[in-house]
């Protein structure tokens, strides 16, 4: 569109992937988080200093986020308020959350 020879650009609102369950909207995220790494073997000091931490990626719907926890699900019943593939993360382990666009 133009107005007096000037092009007008309308900014399009982003649309995000989501699920609607019992009239509530749940958004889909890519969540990056840190997980512990365990090893029951013996280690010297140098090996202890090099212990890695696991950097994990989860893709899921966010059920609830509080100051302490992030609760997610990946599957749900289309006819009832039933969730599967659930996780609860301590919020301190979460590095980032990116809402997925359509």
Residue ranges and their predicted role:
Residues 1-10:
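N-terminal amphipathic/basic-hydrophobic helices that include classical n-h-c signal peptides
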Residues 11-102:
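Conserved RNA-binding domains used in RNP assembly and mRNA/RNA metabolism
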């Amino acid at each position: 569109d133009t107005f007096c020879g000037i092009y007008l650009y309308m900014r399009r609102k982003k649309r995000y992937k989501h699920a609607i369950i019992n009239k509530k909207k749940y958004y889909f995220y890519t969540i990056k988080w840190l997980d512990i790494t365990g090893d029951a073997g013996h280690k010297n000091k140098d090996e202890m200093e090099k212990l890695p931490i696991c950097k994990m990626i989860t893709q899921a719907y966010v059920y609830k986020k509080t100051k302490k926890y992030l609760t997610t699900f990946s599957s749900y019943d289309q006819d009832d308020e039933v969730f599967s593939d659930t996780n609860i993360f301590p919020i301190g382990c979460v590095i980032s959350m990116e809402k997925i666009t359509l």
